[in-house]
Every structure is written in C-alpha cells, then in structure tokens.
C-alpha cells in the first residue's frame, strides 16, 4: 500500500503534444505547494538518458518516485506518454495500491493535432513529425476502463478544471 487516505494520485497520459505537461503544471499551480509532478520525460530522458524500451529502468523509477511522494503526503501527478503496453501494469498497481483517491486520464488527440501542437512548443526542434509518427499510438487506453478520456477539443483550461473538479483537489486555506 502507498500514500494515505488523504493523498490524491492523478495520472495524465496521452500522445506527444497532447498537453500532459501543461496540465500537470497547471494542476500544481492551482493547488500550490504539496503537489509532486512525476514527469516521465524528466526521469527517462534527463535522469537516466534511457530510450523508451520494454522493461526500461525508468518504469520502476517512476513508480518509486510516485510512491515516495505519496508516502510523504504529497498529492502526486504522474504524467507522460506512458504507453499502455509498457507502463500499464505499473500504473494499474500504483492506482490499486494507493490508499487515497486515484484518477487516471488519457488526453486523446489524433496524429495531425499532435503535430500541430508540437510545432508551437519550445522543444519543437528536438524531434520531427516523422519521429512522432514512430511512437504515436492512437487511443492507447489502459485495459479495464481505468481512465477517463479527455477529447482533443477540450481546452487546457477546461481539462484542468475538469480534473480539479473530479479529484476535489483544492488548495488548503492560506493565511494572508
């Protein structure tokens, strides 16, 4: 078991360019201190400099960091492409083991939309639409109906508002 009955786990998955990192950042900004963001790209690409392969070390590291944050009372947002085939079993175990509320989301976006969004990002030069095509998996949902699907027409504000409402993740009272 991991976390407490008071911690909230949010998983935000979807294709490259779907807005996962933006959603995670906005959730943290809305709540303030007390939200840990566990970003697949940071752990896999920056910390480990590992390719996304089946059985990669980053899968266990993502799980470990998320559990550590939950066990220390942080609400936790895990975000990344997190392909169902590779990361699904870990995410299902994490959600099942979590003592608090767990909410999993898939930001659905077709390939053309992900390419359009990618062109507007600061890291647009890091990889090409051809690279994106190699790893794009349409509607890559976790088995068992664990996720709520957020359609591509949902704006960033709408998506964040929906997740905040679903999770009841509201900031603690702050003294002025």
Language-model features: locations:
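P-loop (Walker A) phosphate-binding loop of NTP-binding proteins
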Residues: 15
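Conserved substrate/cofactor phosphate-moiety recognition/catalytic segment
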Residues: 25-71
């Amino acid at each position: 078991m991991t976390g407490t009955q008071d911690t909230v786990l949010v998983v935000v998955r979807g294709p490259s360019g779907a807005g996962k990192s933006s959603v995670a950042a906005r959730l943290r900004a809305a709540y303030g201190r007390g939200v840990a963001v566990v970003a697949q790209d940071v752990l896999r690409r920056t910390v480990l400099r590992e390719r996304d392969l089946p059985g990669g070390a980053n899968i266990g590291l993502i799980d470990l960091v998320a559990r550590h944050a939950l066990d220390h009372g942080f609400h936790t947002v895990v975000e990344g492409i997190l392909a169902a085939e590779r990361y699904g079993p870990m995410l299902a175990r994490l959600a099942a083991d979590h003592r608090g509320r767990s909410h999993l989301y898939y930001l659905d976006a077709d390939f053309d939309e992900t390419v359009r969004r990618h062109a507007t990002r600061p890291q647009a030069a890091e990889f090409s639409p051809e690279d994106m095509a190699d790893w794009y998996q349409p509607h890559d949902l976790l088995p068992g109906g664990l996720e709520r699907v957020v359609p591509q027409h949902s704006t960033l504000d709408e998506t964040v508002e929906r997740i905040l409402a679903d999770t009841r993740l509201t900031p603690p009272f702050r003294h002025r």
